[in-house]
Amino acid sequence: MSILFRALNWLMFVDPAWTKERLIPILVFEHPASEPAWNGFLHGDVPSAPLAEIIKPLLLDLIPWIEIFSWERAISEVVSQWLGEMRVFHPDKPSGLSQSEMRAVLRSMRDDTRNSFINWLGFVGQENEHNWLNYVIPLIDECWPRERQYRTSASMRAWIGLLDDSGDSFPVVYEVVKKFLVSVEINDHVFYRFTEEISDEKPITARFPDETLDLINRVTPQVLSHLPYEVLALIEETEPRLTSDARYLRLIDLVERS
């Protein structure tokens, strides 16, 4: 069964009528063979547009269902990326997702799956310099859940990881991401790339000191055990005027009191 459904895209191309009549019903969650069928299918290729259109109602509810089983976590990540591609590349089409559908999918994910999805968005952005503006920013701005319960220390690390991958697009990506950031205790190691030269490019902090200062201030709580000393030092070196900024003064006060 798993081997058969791994070829579902090809079967849909070769004989769509037979595939819709004989195979698609097996994917309904109540079918006794649905578990091995989905397991095989999810180890295959991204569903084609005609197939995605047919099984879309099942895909929308798939993540909570597969998390009932003891499959490897990567399976949930595969589904989340398929759904992300349906929203990013086929928005509001029969084979794609609407804003509300994508938002509901994101809410249905476990925290670790949602954070892996953030990492995937970073990969999408890095594939082409225009992808940040054309695909990544719209999905985050239009679809990401606003509720406080989705802003965890793990999600902060994921968002910061996405930001330090955004290169020249850092200011515009940060502008949309910052609404999902809250002050939580996180290891200062997540900021190491903000002070390091990557591929002979100046560090993010040296290129965008104002946005970096705002980021550090936004995610730093009043009491913490790890402080981003190197980032603050580079901000002072790159843009001395910011040393009189209220955000900088607050962070320096935390440094001096620690």
Labelled PLM ranges:
Residues 1-258:
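Non-catalytic all-alpha helical scaffold/repeat segments
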